[in-house]
Amino acid sequence: RAFEESFRKLNIPYRIFGGLSFYQRKEIKDLIAYYRLTANHRDEEALKRVINYPARGIGKTTMDRLLVESTEREVSIWDLVTDVFNPPVSVQGAALRKVQDFTSMIQSFAAEMPTKDAHDLGMYIAKHTGLVHTLYQDKTPEGVARYDNLQELLNGMKAFTDQAKESEPDELPTLGD
């Protein structure tokens, strides 16, 4: 990852052989998708990626129904499931509650954006989504590597925010900026 970061910083093209780029790994893409959805609730790609990861009982059938209904209504999936005056008719009961619990969780992350830096928000998201717990529970070599990769991403965010605090202590941007 250190080489990748250095090459990116210097705008040097590079190619990874025999593995994945750090930022192409599932666990990294998942946390970044949570960031994206926190900053932009209508990011459908991010929503579809993480709405049921870690597993929260929101399956393909529920998502297919929401996608069809949101297309028919010409609104985003987010707008469809958060409209209290005109809730979805294609998904109801326990399935709808699970989706609404998910949107409430994302809204709680958004409420933290103005007060947390990138690292603190990342830690908050990773903990409250269950990403850290899910990856920590997987004791296979791949699971341990995924957990380590997530920790490395969070450590990189910490280094970035610490460096930014040192150079401009009064002007550290938050994700909300």
Describe the residue ranges of each PLM region.
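Acidic beta-strand-to-loop metal/phosphate-binding motif
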Residues: 1
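Conserved helicase C-terminal RecA-like lobe
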Residues: 4-13, 25, 32-177
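Conserved helicase motor
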Residues: 17-25
